[in-house]
Amino acid sequence: MTTNSTHRGPSGILVLGGTGKTGRRVVDRLRATGTTTVRPASRSGEVRFDWALPDTWEPALAGAEALYLVAPEDPSPVEEFVTRAEASGVRRLVVLSGHGIEHAGEGFGRGMAAAEEAARESGAEWTLLRPNNFFQNFDEDLWLAPLREGRLGLPIGDVPEPFVDADDVAAVAAAVLTEDGHAGRTYVLSGPRALTFAGAAKTIARAAGRPVRYEELSPAAYRAELLAQGWPEAAADSLGAMFALHRAGHSAEVTDDVRRVLGREPADLEPWARRIAATGVWA
């Protein structure tokens, strides 16, 4: 159910994943406005929150009228949490999901899909954010080590991806959490142009001034590499399912939703890569 009423902005906002890639950026943007109380929640952050410990939910939700929901991999607690959030006074839900999630199967994104469904079925105003892969996957975690080693091997082929800056995603989330007019909307958040992963690797190599080779892997070879690196089987299978979604072209579309919300174009990968390369992160 969707409510499109006009009202004052929320007096309190709970940000799940408050120390994570998008969550911490959302917190920073909201706090910079100084117009609302922002509570970043995580297992070890300012506000304790653990999906596996329901006793942590209600204390975290206390005083929150808006919620930035970053779902767990396990979908089982999501519906009950959203029900409790509504009961505690949350009237605006912003769900972080993923581009193409509506095409995902059992192997990837079950938590995100459950969060989308729970939001739609709730009585709160809801907005879904479906971003592409973040620029920051190249410099903060997922693909940082391979880039430093000079070889990025993935099972994606030549299907393009319009990578998006997590800062743009956070800016959209902050706007949607605090402004009216977004209820019942699904925003697909992409960068301004699509690049293959090989093209992204070349862009980063050029910015860093060092060689980076892209190698196309079969899904089986990619899984074997992840397991050899110590990844748990479930995580390796989830990444494999994510790339299967990409290979099918379900996240290749460039959208204008960042511009629609923010009134400006999204960041481009190339100038971002030059700026990040100057920090020495890929040296």
Question: Where do the language-model regions lie?
Answer:
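Oxidoreductase cofactor-interface core, primarily capturing Rossmann-like NAD(P)-dependent enzymes
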Residues: T2-T36, P40-R43, A52-D55, A62-A64, ...
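Structural motif detector for alpha-helix initiation sites
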Residues: A166, F197, P219, D268-L269
